[in-house]
Amino acid sequence: MKIYFLLGIFLTFLLHTRICQGIKWLALAKTPLSLALNQSQHCKQLEGLVSSQMQLCRSNLELMQTIIHAAKEVKKTCIKAFTDMRWNCSSIELAPTFHQDLERGTRESAFVYALSAAAISHTIARACTTGDIPGCSCAPIPGESPGPGYRWGGCADNLNYGILMGSKFSDAPMKMKKSGSQANKLMHLHNSEVGRQVLKASLEMKCKCHGVSGSCSIKTCWRGLQELREIALDLKTKYLSATKVVHRPMGTRKQLVPKDIDIRPVQETEMIYLQSSPDYCLKNEKMGSHGTHERQCNKTSNGSDSCDLMCCGRGYNPYMDKVVERCHCKYHWCCYVTCKKCERTVERYVCK
């Protein structure tokens, strides 16, 4: 009986270690700048890749520096987006191993998968525009006219190529046969697609003025993506309203359906999760919670960074902080500005 018990623990461990393979590639953010990626055997030196991603690396070496940059952008952008929340995305720094906040099918892992999918396609699309990827250039000029007084020009972000190559790489782990439970694979693939949908929706017309004395008689326009930080904020809104789902039979196969209203299928645009998260008030390394003790809070805010919410009702302590700012700035003809440095004391607050 003891053998079966230990075997059960081992199988459970294997299942959990496979669950988050889809974002292990974020470990690429740790890749040293000194690593040259000009030969296929260099792919073996990259951390966090599954076999199918390793193959993509070997056959698309020219993409790898861009994908490494995408991994760095995911980490930076996630931490920035959640700086005012109890869960502050700091556990993303642990890649390629994670705590349960990103290892299980949580709301937090839903956000990171969506952001990762959006970021890799965004970064590749932008790299095409800047000429950083051989064989990939600006997006084709649209067939329709931009309107009177406007003309197509510039270099549009190559979103189609970004999504094609980005999804091949980021979705590869979830499409492997041995990549965790079917429910988790479906959840992560769904949220990755949500990330790409938000990315597509961020494509907007950008224009530059031309004309005598700045008259802007003609505008040259192209289609460009919003900055990744703006896309992350849209995804954060979806995170806050995410739907909890269950994996149950629907017709001839199992599908993910909303837990509380399982009479309808999951909407393509909604972020979903399988397992509820803790409140992240107290430190619990296993759960990926650093707690909010000594986290800075905003005494006058009504949002998630307010001292009431951030401190989970434990109260807060004030402290005085010295801030150095530019002051007494003067404009000099022509054309520069000089400023002095001024110091002032401000009151800040940290959670008990």
Curated annotation (Swiss-Prot):
Signal peptide annotation: 1-22
Lineage of source species: Eukaryota, Metazoa, Chordata, Craniata, Vertebrata
Purpose of the protein: Ligand for members of the frizzled family of seven transmembrane receptors. Shares much functionality with wnt11b. Signals through a non-canonical Wnt pathway to activate Jun-N-terminal kinase (JNK) to regulate gastrulation movements. Acts in a non-cell-autonomous manner to control neural crest migration, probably acting as an extracellular signal from surrounding tissue, but is not required for neural crest induction. Acts redundantly with wnt11b during pronephros induction. Regulates cardiac morphogenesis through the activation of JNK, but is not required for cardiac differentiation.
Residues carrying sugar: 38, 88, 298, 302
Lipidation, O-palmitoleoyl serine type: 213
UniProt-listed SMART domains: WNT1
Leftover remarks: Xenopus and other lower vertebrates contain duplicated wnt11 genes (wnt11 and wnt11b) resulting from an ancient gene duplication event, but the second copy has since been lost in mammals.
Classification via InterPro entries: Wnt (IPR005817), Wnt_C (IPR043158), Wnt_CS (IPR018161)
Location within or outside the cell: Secreted, Extracellular space, Extracellular matrix
Keyword terms, alphabetized: Developmental protein, Disulfide bond, Extracellular matrix, Gastrulation, Glycoprotein, Lipoprotein, Secreted, Signal, Sulfation, Wnt signaling pathway
Main location: secreted
Disulfide bonds: 78-89, 128-136, 138-155, 207-221, 209-216, 281-312, 297-307, 311-351, 327-342, 329-339, 334-335
UniProt keyword Nucleus, yes or no: no
Post-translational modification Sulfotyrosine, affected residues: 273, 280
Protein name listed in UniProt: Protein Wnt-11
